Amino acid sequence: MKCTETDCELPKYGIVTNGMLLDKEKMEYFSQNRVQVMVSIDGNRALHDAVRLGINKIATFDKISEKVKELTKSYNLFFELTLNREHILAYSEESVREWFESLKSMGFRVGNVGIIEMSKDVSLDLCPEDYEIFQKIERDMIDYFFKEMETEKPLYNIDIFRVLMRLLRKDTKSYSCGAGVSQITMTTEGVILPCPKFAEHGFDLEIGTDKWQNEKIQNVIMNEFKKDCDNCWARQLCIGYCYALKYRDEEKNVY
């Protein structure tokens, strides 16, 4: 309300959902209020239903796919694919292309790819022996999205596109991530976090009503210890470092 009263541009918001409850009424509300909606969906039916069953332990892929196909005719929806050990086990030379073609067929045009971290189901976490296959998946994924840029209606990966734009603009950044710098997250309990990955780890930015208390986030982002990255030419272009992982396990120097 204060933004509209002062002719201030409304901020953008984002939510991540499994998509089960999305409909045109909700999407219309989100569209009018600058809320970007991202749907968690892990590629094809077999992979998605292996890890994302509904509350009744039933498969969800077909229902979500049907909703997304209808809604993307009128609204922009983003995808979020989370790589987990099921992707490692299912990998073949054609599998990465098949995962993204499945998403594209639903009407998605933009999204990102994450990696599972400290899952409640430890069987889904990646293991050291998975690294070789993970590298192949990353290679195939980058090849896929570069080829997509040459098509009439490409599917974009937000992170790959962001790095390319930084290169084209010669735009280097002091921060590896926007967590707590250009973005914040609010939980359903009203706790304010730098990003969703800080959830359930006792972190609260404690932003007051009259001023920004930023000492906490400064302690996280001002003391990066990614020593192995010091001599890398791409350190100010890279967006792979995660402040949340650092906060959760500083001694392991995870990045």
Identify what each model region corresponds to.
Residues 184, 202, 236-239, 245, ...:
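Cys/His-rich zinc-coordinating "finger/knuckle" motifs
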Residues 249-255:
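Short microdomains enriched in Cys/His and/or Lys/Arg
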Residues 46-179, 183-185, 203:
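Radical SAM enzyme [4Fe-4S]-AdoMet core and its adjacent flexible, acidic
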Residues 133-167, 192-240:
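C-terminal accessory region of radical SAM enzymes
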Residues 1-50, 54-63, 81-98:
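Canonical radical SAM enzyme core domain
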Residues 187-189:
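Short, acidic, Ser/Thr-enriched surface-loop or helix-capping motifs
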